[in-house]
Amino acid sequence: MSAFPLIIGVDEAGRGPWAGPVTAAAVILDPAQPIEGLTDSKKLSEKARDRLAPLIRERALAWCVAEASVEEIDTLNIRQATFLAMRRAILGQSRTDQDRSGQFETVSATAGLILIDGNALPGDLPAPARAIIKGDLTEPAISAASILAKTHRDAQMASLCNLYPGYGFSGHKGYGTAAHAAALTRLGPCPVHRQSFAPVRALLRPC
């Protein structure tokens, strides 16, 4: 890996939930500004993630958070929608300017390798890429991407909780908990539920 000038680390958050978008982040870390405590976001407490996320945004050479919508998940399937979110993050195609660092495209264009957590790669990437199983535990850039993707998506789900009260999105973040299942049964699916997911599809009716 040392032969490559810069590495883009990529990870996603939100493949499994019944509701909300799937989010991906791409991060190029600065070797001159190491960040202590980077690991898989799922291994960290919410407090630790919230502490690390601004450090990553501050110290990384470049970063971007992107997503694929519920509609894209239902149209493409969750695997392809995840790949779409990853490609968008790698290319700097965030939903807003606040979701990426300045000059992201300029910096990322100099990267020689893309490291993606998992066992499969999206197609049509701008640089050589490798999939690394449990890469969020072994590659700091992937760990950083994992944290940015997770904290960004969690904040989105908290906002959706205000738009669609009663489902408890700020707590379970759209995952299939008992409380979420009970709310679905009581209220029916709402517009941010993934209709292609079986537990939601079984209850399709206006909310």
Swiss-Prot record:
It comes from the Bacteria. Its EC number is 3.1.26.4. Residues 5-207 form the RNase H type-2 domain. Its cofactor is Mn(2+); Mg(2+). SUPFAM superfamilies: Ribonuclease H-like. Pfam families: RNase_HII (PF01351). The gene is rnhB. Keywords: Cytoplasm, Endonuclease, Hydrolase, Manganese, Metal-binding, Nuclease. The keyword ATP-binding does not apply. GO terms for biological process: DNA replication, removal of RNA primer; mismatch repair. It is found in: Cytoplasm. Belongs to the RNase HII family. GO terms for molecular function: manganese ion binding; RNA binding; RNA-DNA hybrid ribonuclease activity. It catalyses: Endonucleolytic cleavage to 5'-phosphomonoester. Endonuclease that specifically degrades the RNA of RNA-DNA hybrids. A divalent metal cation binds at D11, E12, D117. This is Ribonuclease HII. One of its GO terms (cellular component) is cytoplasm. The keyword Hydrolase applies. InterPro entries: RNase_HII (IPR022898), RNase_HII/HIII (IPR001352), RNase_HII/HIII_dom (IPR024567), RNaseH-like_sf (IPR012337), RNaseH_sf (IPR036397). Manganese or magnesium. Binds 1 divalent metal ion per monomer in the absence of substrate. May bind a second metal ion after substrate binding. It comes from Hyphomonas neptunium (strain ATCC 15444).
